Amino acid sequence: MKEKKRLRLEREAREREKAEKWEPIFNVKEKFAFLRWLDPFTYADMFLEKIGKKENSAISWAVYLATAFLSALLLYNALGLLFHSPSPMVIVVSGSMEPSFYRGDVMALSGWSLEELNAPLVEMPGTEIDGLDISEYSYSECSVKGVEGLEPCRSVIKKIQSGALQVSAKDVLAEKIVFPKLGKEIDITKKGDVVVYFSETQGIPIIHRAIAKIRAKDGFFVLTKGDSVLNSFIDQDTALSYGAVPFNKLQGKTVFMIPWIGYVKLILLDDLPCFLSSPVTKAKCQFP
């Protein structure tokens, strides 16, 4: 009897010791119990219990999916109001900004004024440039590996297309933007803010760096370029953008990045349909 009593007392002592050890954690859990009301699925569970369908897997799945969709929609719109941007979240769809950002990264965007945009300013108060090719008022200059000095980037592009110049993308780089009528040159750097605009020619949002901002007679505009070493030319010298991007066509500038979480969407909704499409369509796909 004494032995049994001793064992019982030891067991009770161990249980008290264990309870005392975990008590702070339980207290913290109780302290932050109110956070459950921030979880939208708490309300989904309450709804299912109220209608008596929580054990019905089909109805439960439908309610949970609807809850997830509505929660994402509300969060998206809330971020839009918070960041003053109609498109607060955008997925990087190509590698044109590597190593700054990678395909599948999600960028959070905010609205801003021209003064707040970090990029060299060019004043052209007497010139209207909306809808004009940039060759009407400026041109970019490129360096080519093995060639001394700089030459107009569009001249380099023509030589590459004709076969007169055999180089890889890494061997060519846009270095300057020249505004001959103003006697002004701007070095192309990676110090400007990253902005997002919709490319009419490509049908996708472009996430590139602002390399110059222009205050013209007919409004504000931005010149852009990707950071990647494989992205040799500014957007306005390629098929991404016909002219300088009007300020009101910008969706926002990036304020922070969430890595990789957009990759699932790209694989399921972009890559897979492209992979299964015709050869003509497949050639336009943005594969990694």
Give the role of each language-model region.
Residues 87, 198-209, 241-246:
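Short coil-to-beta-strand transition motifs
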Residues 120, 181-199:
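Short coil-to-beta transition motif at edge beta-strands of beta-rich domains
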Residues 107-109, 194-197, 251:
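Hydrophobic beta-strand signal
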Residues 92, 206-214:
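Short beta-strand-centered aromatic/proline hotspots
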Residues 1-179, 257-288:
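Protein maturation boundaries and topogenic segments
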Residues 122-125, 198, 211-213:
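PDZ peptide-recognition modules
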